[in-house]
Amino acid sequence: MRCSAVSLGSGTIINAIATGFGSAFGVDLKIKADVELVDNCKKIINGISIDNPTLKPSLVERCVKNVLDHFEVDYSAKISTSGDIPIKSGLSSSSAASNAAVLATIGALGEKVDSDLVLDLAIKSSFEEKLTITGAYDDATASYFGGITVCNNMERKILKKDEFKEDIKVIVLMPEFQKNVDVNRMKLIKDYVEIAFEKCMEGDYYKALFLNGLLYSSALNFPSNISVDALEAGAITAGLSGTGPSYVALCYSEDKKNVENALKKYGNTVITKPSTNGARILY
């Protein structure tokens, strides 16, 4: 009983920590999970990251366990993950890994895939591993469905689905900044993030992303000039992704080199694009 599945990374439009309402968009970076089940009544689960063998596999192991518990089976399992989403970069690597792990395990069992169940078990696993503050329903849904999702994270409801109407590129900056998750400081900007969220609900995703990035980078002591540098180089919008340290900049194809050159002085960059091709079983 084997199955492989993939799920997307995502970039932030609105970080939900301040208000409980958030938005994210799928990007063409993925994590793949390969699951093999053994019917031996032992329920021994072993995981490994192919790209980073020293990375603790506790999240994906928890995902497999929660799926097996849900379907009341006591199989053992091996799970391996691989992909091109940097860990702890603000690009929803945890959401992508948990979605892919849950989906691959359900596929290996031969059970019918139900999107709500996949998301619930993936988020449950992330909570249990203390990898999320809000449940990251916006990140999880953008990773799973692709495109843009606008969500009430507290109630796990998608308020709106959309996609970028233009053919744009995504420049991801991954600077060597110390990650800072100060929830109290993020709560202080709640009233101002609500203004950015209103822009998001109106469909003005570029302004929402930029405003959100300025607010959260200020709260978390990341440089806000990076986003302005990206605009100066031709980006449509730019901002902090998640709680950082990554930034995302959106631009037209003809501007991607200028934008990348403006950003790469701060750290490594990756050029990708928005994706509407969400999570799926490969085989």
From Swiss-Prot:
UniProt cross-references to PANTHER family, sorted A to Z: HOMOSERINE/4-DIPHOSPHOCYTIDYL-2-C-METHYL-D-ERYTHRITOL KINASE, SHIKIMATE KINASE
Molecular function as annotated in GO: ATP binding; shikimate kinase activity
Family statement drawn from the similarity comment of this UniProt entry: Belongs to the GHMP kinase family. Archaeal shikimate kinase subfamily.
CC annotations in GO: cytoplasm
Catalytic activity as recorded in UniProt: shikimate + ATP = 3-phosphoshikimate + ADP + H(+)
Keyword check for Lyase: no
Keywords annotated in UniProt: Amino-acid biosynthesis, Aromatic amino acid biosynthesis, ATP-binding, Cytoplasm, Kinase, Nucleotide-binding, Transferase
Coiled-coil stretches: none
EC code(s) of this entry: 2.7.1.71
Gene3D superfamilies: 3.30.230.10, GHMP kinase, C-terminal domain (3.30.70.890)
Listed name of the protein: Shikimate kinase
Gene: aroK
Location(s) in or outside the cell: Cytoplasm
HAMAP family (alphabetical): Shik_kinase_arch
Pathway(s) served: Metabolic intermediate biosynthesis; chorismate biosynthesis; chorismate from D-erythrose 4-phosphate and phosphoenolpyruvate: step 5/7
Species whose genome carries this gene: Methanococcus maripaludis (strain C5 / ATCC BAA-1333)
Pfam families linked to this entry: GHMP_kinases_C, GHMP_kinases_N
Keyword Cytoplasm carried by entry: yes
Chief place of localization: cytoplasm
GO BP field: amino acid biosynthetic process; aromatic amino acid family biosynthetic process; chorismate biosynthetic process
